[in-house]
């Protein structure tokens, strides 16, 4: 029996409709909350979920899958868990946790998820980047060779940092770790103002982990007053935020910094501080019933920090020659650098700047212990003139500390020992610097050159700061610019005469 044209047409229509019935059909995998509390939700039914995938709870709160077990999935909640109840639906998003990145982020304050919290509206043009990505491989990297100037005499002369380096700031609470980090951000202002191309500009990302809101507010005010917020991004996971957000914040900040690194630009990222991130991760791990190890930290706490800090790198010329410099901060308890987290991070980084309470109270600020501080790769990036000027100063300081310990017994000292003590006292005085007053590198070179060459030896210690202020204001700008290259014999004569003449006025 043949179908009429009308019936055949209808049959074809039905067949095509049935064939395309599932074409635009969206299937969501959903699960149900079994238990919830302390920022952790156990969810049943998400069998296909990936590790690190973002999920959405019924009340709109987001979470991330961390524990994949036989029956349940352990999910950390990015927000308050009070509105989540047993039996609530949980939906997979199918995407790994990502955050916004790009130049639109500059000048903004965001939370660990990249959501603006500064009350200045939504973000404009930006791209999304995953918070967890693999660090650049060996062939994609280049050795550190460009200086990253902090504006601090003690750092730029004795523990220099290069673009792409990881330099740890370690010390007890209230020793000036955050101040060094902020000074470094402020110093980029004058470097960026002189930059002639994008490849010279340095962008900054500051990640505040577990700090008080008032402290973060003061930091924002300091950066705004110095017009430093225009090239900076602030990521804040304060003490009142849940542990999962404090754990996530450094990775979010790193993803924002990687945007600049991967596009041939330079960025500096400060993690303040990673001790609090480790504590937040310990809290999450124990609540997820992971077995505790040393100091109750989970076994993978080393990997927590190593996978983060390995993402700071200097890229090769073939991959854009960008860089990401990391300054992680670690807080020690009573100066114990041999604790678990400090030793972990020391072994990951390319050097450390050690700050001590005793030096801080003695008025040596920044309170850097030059003997314990080291920069493993920074000397390759140090300016030639600075290297020439301060080459012997570290050795002289070490000799001074050794001799000063014996000199306090009051025995008679010969002329050579007395000269060493005089020089050492001045070399200890010169690196002192007030808070939020970074010094351009060429002015630093002149000040240190004067101290190393003995122009301050007969000067009272309390006049050294006056001498320092008098130097830069009277030096020809051409000479300051020339000092950036290196000190030839011809160039040395002009500063020598000038510095001696200034010193004689203050003796």
Curated annotation (Swiss-Prot):
| Predominant location category | mitochondrion
Which cysteines are cross-linked by disulfides?
none
What are the binding positions for ATP in this chain? Answer: 171-178
Q: Where in the cell is it found?
A: Mitochondrion; Mitochondrion inner membrane
Which domain of life does the protein's organism represent? Eukaryota
Listed GO molecular functions?
ATP binding; proton-transporting ATP synthase activity, rotational mechanism
A cellular component annotation (GO) from this entry:
mitochondrial inner membrane
Q: Matching SUPFAM superfamilies, A to Z?
A: C-terminal domain of alpha and beta subunits of F1 ATP synthase, N-terminal domain of alpha and beta subunits of F1 ATP synthase, P-loop containing nucleoside triphosphate hydrolases
List the keywords (alphabetical). Answer: ATP synthesis, ATP-binding, CF(1), Hydrogen ion transport, Ion transport, Membrane, Mitochondrion, Mitochondrion inner membrane, Nucleotide-binding, Transport
Q: Where is this site: Required for activity?
A: 373
The protein's matches in InterPro entries, at most eight in alphabetical order, are given as: ATP_synth_asu-like_sf (IPR023366), ATP_synth_asu_C (IPR000793), ATP_synth_asu_C_sf (IPR038376), ATP_synth_F1_a_nt-bd_dom (IPR033732), ATP_synth_F1_asu (IPR005294), ATPase_a/bsu_AS (IPR020003), ATPase_F1/V1/A1_a/bsu_N (IPR004100), ATPase_F1/V1/A1_a/bsu_N_sf (IPR036121)
Its family remark reads: Belongs to the ATPase alpha/beta chains family.
User: What is the purpose of this protein?
Assistant: Mitochondrial membrane ATP synthase (F(1)F(0) ATP synthase or Complex V) produces ATP from ADP in the presence of a proton gradient across the membrane which is generated by electron transport complexes of the respiratory chain. F-type ATPases consist of two structural domains, F(1) - containing the extramembraneous catalytic core, and F(0) - containing the membrane proton channel, linked together by a central stalk and a peripheral stalk. During catalysis, ATP synthesis in the catalytic domain of F(1) is coupled via a rotary mechanism of the central stalk subunits to proton translocation.
Matching NCBIfam families: atpA, PRK13343.1
Its assembly, as annotated, is: F-type ATPases have 2 components, CF(1) - the catalytic core - and CF(0) - the membrane proton channel. CF(1) has five subunits: alpha(3), beta(3), gamma(1), delta(1), epsilon(1). CF(0) has three main subunits: a, b and c.
Q: What is this protein called?
A: ATP synthase subunit alpha, mitochondrial
What organism is listed for this UniProt entry? Brassica napus
> Which gene is this protein's source?
ATPA
